[in-house]
């Protein structure tokens, strides 16, 4: 993974965590746990999916669905 991709993933992850904190009222630790332990995060790290390149809004829709319904 090159530095550009790592930067995109890190920035996306930060934005997802901030949205989870805002929308679900979780602490920073709880939001980090929710994002890092999600199926979506695993898919973001799988570069073949291309999710790391999609917008935070698009990825948040998937994450929100997973957190509410338990699946993507």
Region annotations inferred by a language model:
Residues 1-72:
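C-terminal alpha-helical interaction appendages
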